[in-house]
Amino acid sequence: MKASIRNKLERLRERHEEISALLAEPDTASDQKRFAALSREYAQLEPVIAELNHYQETEQALASAREMARDDDLEIREMAEEEISQAQARLEALEAELQVLLLPPDPNDGRNLYLEIRAGTGGDEAALFAGDLLRMYARYAERHGWRLEEISASEGEQGGYKEVITRISGEGAWSRLKFESGAHRVQRVPETESQGRIHTSACTVAVLPEPDAVEDITINPAELRVDTFRASGAGGQHVNKTDSAIRITHLPTGVVVECQSERSQHKNRAQALALLQARLKNAQQAEQSAQQTEQRRQLVGSGDRSERIRTYNFPQGRITDHRINLTLYRLEEILQGDLDQLVEPLRTEHQADQLAALAGD
């Protein structure tokens, strides 16, 4: 094992012991926010320390076997050689596992998210494709046991959506869907096309992590303009009787959010504020990372909305993810929600890139 990696592991062990002591202090237990943060960090370190313990136990077993290999007894030496071989193989496997555990965690991996789909070039056909994408993500969410809630929607004239915003909640939602941000291109023959010509349209997808209730983005109520209006769409007669829908404008930035998914104006306001907070935090993070352009253009892409990440070719039943040059002729399966055929290779590529960076430290 490289000395730099061993040093990192020892520092993590020291931190693990430090947190253990802090959690036992009465002052920590009385501070709920600090206690929760330390508990999360402790839980993240637990698998690393457990694996490190296994690694060091195996190192000790290897040292003992090498000592035995110097014995005068031939039978003992042969047994020791076999133990040496097994211990070395275990050490290699454990080191690989430790390197994966050392990869920096995405601070948003435990969060829920907002998924925004907007029709781009292509008019009605782009709006229809936005509807296809929403159904794909809804089926994918169902496969993983996540909950998908519609926050706001603007329907297309011929179906689909000009824009649709949803909230997806559930374990692992962000870690799997975070690679979906970008431009999604579709190539197919529209139903209205009499000549059979293939048209190209596009939609943009933005995936934003939902901030915690105690997030560090502070919104000044004086900087908000709140408008109410009557909700449109499904919902029975109720939507025509009360101004339950909410539109909030953040005056300093011009960011506008709407929510009309709930019958309660209070609930719609809370949802809209949460979405506004997510957008403002995303903008803040983008500004902070503007100087790290090269890092943001790793193999899985930067996630910029303008970046074309994927092409859906209906005549050929083909889907191509341009970030990792992966082409699959399983378009229908993926549109039915089997998105892991793309997500897993993206996650693997991202992890490989992180491991390469770790090895270069």
UniProtKB/Swiss-Prot annotation:
Alphabetized GO MF terms: translation release factor activity, codon specific
Keyword Membrane: no
Domain of life (superkingdom): Bacteria
InterPro entries xref list: PCRF, Pep_chain_release_fac_I, Pep_chain_release_fac_I_sf, Prokaryotic/Mito_RF, RF-1
Pfam families registered for this protein in UniProt: PCRF, RF-1
Protein biosynthesis as UniProt keyword: yes
Gene Ontology CC annotation, any one: cytoplasm
Entry protein name: Peptide chain release factor 1
Modified residues (N5-methylglutamine): 237
Family classification: Belongs to the prokaryotic/mitochondrial release factor family.
PTM notes: Methylated by PrmC. Methylation increases the termination efficiency of RF1.
Protein function: Peptide chain release factor 1 directs the termination of translation in response to the peptide chain termination codons UAG and UAA.
Organism whose genome encodes this protein: Alkalilimnicola ehrlichii (strain ATCC BAA-1101 / DSM 17681 / MLHE-1)
Keyword terms: Cytoplasm, Methylation, Protein biosynthesis
Cross-referenced PROSITE patterns: RF_PROK_I
Subcellular location: Cytoplasm
